[in-house]
Amino acid sequence: MSKIIGIDLGTTNSAVAVLEGGEAKIIPNPEGARTTPSVVGFKNGERQVGEVAKRAAITNPNTISSIKRHMGTNYKETIEGKDYSPQEISAIILQYLKSYAEDYLGETVDKAVITVPAYFNDAQRQATKDAGKIAGLEVERIINEPTAAALAYGMDKTETDQTILVFDLGGGTFDVSILELGDGVFEVHSTAGDNELGGDDFDKKIIDYLVAEFKKDNGIDLSQDKMALQRLKDAAEKAKKDLSGVTSTQISLPFITAGEAGPLHLEVTLTRAKFDELTHDLVERTIAPTRQALKDANLSASDIDQVILVGGSTRIPAVQETIKKELGKEPHKGVNPDEVVAMGAAIQGGVITGDVKDVVLLDVTPLSLGIETMGGVMTTLIERNTTIPTSKSQTFSTAADNQPAVDIHVLQGERPMAKDNKTLGRFQLADIPPAPRGIPQIEVSFDIDKNGIVTVRAKDLGTGKEQNIVIKSSSGLTDEEIEKMVQDAEANAEEDKKNKENAELRNNADQLVFTVDKTLKELEGKVEEEEVKKAEAARDELQEALKGEDFDAIKEKTESLNEIVQNLSVKLYEQAAAEQQAAGGAEGQEAPQNDDVVDAEFEEVNDDDKENK
């Protein structure tokens, strides 16, 4: 079997590795560097990738960087009159990595394992896979960056049971994953993150500071000058790196622009203390996901045996100090933050080819998946942090008599109401035979494959007819949306709870009306007409209340109707008992049906444990 290369397709830098002699090795690029800037430039119809494109960015406006931030969206870059999608730009980077890997190996490479941030959603993962396909690579597996890092770290430690926390702060994304290592099994317990936080944001803080200082001294806004801005960007990145090793750095940019009196130069001394002050809020944003990952794994900081740092931004002293303070231990320094992810991807490639044995990788899905059910509620089928690959089925029913079709609205997110979550796709199961509500059995199945990509299927168990969809949303979730989901879930917990209670109240009331209609038909001629009219009046009042949004009134009318129907049932059984006693007293009456039980609008059947929910 041909070799499978491991690729870390990063926001700022990318790397490629291969398994040789049982060890993962980084493949250097043609310039001799072990990582390649994720930068693409277009000039006179020619494409430039990596360091060459990055160096030319100052004079070439047709230069694209940090395209990974737009994966899974409809974003387009227009270059020389042509639109490029994020997948196409990423494919150009992948093609370059593929070409120099082939030169190094002396053979054609057509298979790869590509890493993505753990918090990437379905659309972003699909976009990454598509980029690989465009680049001429068969993507054997999409794996999470922290998981790949753990694989590289733990390959020679498979005999020791330990719990590790991977802290991954890259150029554009931030992830925290907690894994358990032991007996060759790498099991992810939880993952959390922020897809809008990375080294680029630290650079921007320095750029904004330099722009403000220059404007204060010279009255000129450099942010309006594209060439000056590119020079500032390069200088900010260099200053950030310098301040990881020294406490002060000099930023010197001669001839940055020109004023009325002639050329102007930028000279600023940036201290580590000032840098820490500028970026304090960014460092603080790493704390909440870290705590969330621990909480989801049901662990405390003291349960963590090792902390692994991934991504160049983890070299920032303030970041390391925050980790140490939060987790109470020094981070492990035995792995290279820039290379460890690609190496882990190469090891996963070795697992697939069979070159690496006795290693099992168990990853998780970062966000909950479900469908919209009556009342606008999201019914979750697969909870976040569920080990993948996985599949889950539940059985639902129709909400109306003779309903000919059901719409399946597939959702991803943590909020209880459907409207507050992200739509992954919609499809319809049609041609359901006419039947009363609640009779048809519609089985909805979710499958998440080893790459974290979702397939949803709906099947009418009565007819065997089915429909399915592979989620290939072109827009996907933006970084902002995915971060907003979890934050909104926490900030709006009370409102969510109230909305869900109201939806359930409305559903229960609607079900009660349906049950009462059925009961009144059964009682026809068996109880006094006046009692029936009383029940019908209460039912009509509840139906009227259901047209509005006064949930207190709906609750009151529901309780009132419930009480009337219960009394009717009691009288019916008392009457039947009296008749039997008069006729000689037949014993062994069936237990009365409890019409006080109010079901939801659908029936769920959990295939895993065969229990009704």
From Swiss-Prot:
Residues 578-613 are annotated as: Disordered. It comes from Listeria monocytogenes serovar 1/2a (strain ATCC BAA-679 / EGD-e). Acts as a chaperone. This is Chaperone protein DnaK. GO terms for biological process: chaperone cofactor-dependent protein refolding; protein refolding. The modification Phosphothreonine is found at T173. Pfam families: HSP70. InterPro entries: ATPase_NBD, Chaperone_DnaK, Heat_shock_70_CS, HSP70_C_sf, HSP70_peptide-bd_sf, Hsp_70_fam. The lineage of its organism: Bacteria, Bacillati, Bacillota, Bacilli, Bacillales. GO terms for molecular function: ATP binding; ATP hydrolysis activity; ATP-dependent protein folding chaperone; heat shock protein binding; protein folding chaperone; unfolded protein binding. NCBIfam families: PRK00290.1 (NF001413), prok_dnaK (TIGR02350). The gene is dnaK. Residues 578-591 have a biased composition (Low complexity). Belongs to the heat shock protein 70 family. Induction: By stress conditions e.g. heat shock. Residues 596-613 have a biased composition (Acidic residues). It comes from the Bacteria.
